[in-house]
Amino acid sequence: MPLLDSFTVDHTRMEAPAVRVAKTMNTPHGDAITVFDLRFCVPNKEVMPERGIHTLEHLFAGFMRNHLNGNGVEIIDISPMGCRTGFYMSLIGTPDEQRVADAWKAAMEDVLKVQDQNQIPELNVYQCGTYQMHSLQEAQGIARNILERDVRINSNEELALPKEKLQELHI
């Protein structure tokens, strides 16, 4: 099985909250696609609560588009990681990490402005697979945590697992 890019970085040295370019590629037509690791929690030490991350998924995608789309950037998708320590964001374009970090912080400010659970987009049986599994309070707690700790940049070069370690892990 091919080794995914996300498993070539040392999760024990990852900082959070932090932005990292997880992957860059070009389409056959030459469009640049960038995938960002938006790490909300320190791996293996913190985890986002399931209701909070689900609510954040509904809010975050729209708020990030408001703050990041434009000037050669268009978000394709923002999805939570299965480990519940962050989100992956795929987009057209190549914004630098600081631009992404600034948009992320602005989106977290927007999450704090949501006053009622009824303002969560697509919160209904028709548009959400588990529409009863939400918590605005938990999502706002996550947002506050990000803003209090600020957003840093994780460098692939600093986090790269040495080839010897990958061999030792039988990868």
Curated annotation (Swiss-Prot):
Q: What is this protein called?
A: S-ribosylhomocysteine lyase
**GO biological process entries:** quorum sensing
* Purpose of the protein: Involved in the synthesis of autoinducer 2 (AI-2) which is secreted by bacteria and is used to communicate both the cell density and the metabolic potential of the environment. The regulation of gene expression in response to changes in cell density is called quorum sensing. Catalyzes the transformation of S-ribosylhomocysteine (RHC) to homocysteine (HC) and 4,5-dihydroxy-2,3-pentadione (DPD).
Sequence positions that bind Fe cation: H54, H58, C128
Please report which protein family the annotation says this sequence is part of: Belongs to the LuxS family.
Task: Identify the keywords attached in UniProt to this record, alphabetized.
Answer: Autoinducer synthesis, Iron, Lyase, Metal-binding, Quorum sensing
- Name the species this protein comes from: Escherichia coli O7:K1 (strain IAI39 / ExPEC)
What is the top EC class of this enzyme, as a single word? lyase
Q: Tell me which Pfam families the record gives.
A: LuxS (PF02664)
* Matching InterPro entries: LuxS_sf, Metalloenz_LuxS/M16, S-ribosylhomocysteinase
Q: Which cofactor does it need?
A: Fe cation
| EC numbers on record | 4.4.1.21
- Summary of subunit composition and partner proteins: Homodimer.
Entry cofactor note text? Binds 1 Fe cation per subunit.
Which Gene Ontology terms cover its molecular function? iron ion binding; S-ribosylhomocysteine lyase activity
Q: Name the domain of life this protein comes from.
A: Bacteria
Per the record, what are the reactions this protein catalyses? Answer: S-(5-deoxy-D-ribos-5-yl)-L-homocysteine = (S)-4,5-dihydroxypentane-2,3-dione + L-homocysteine
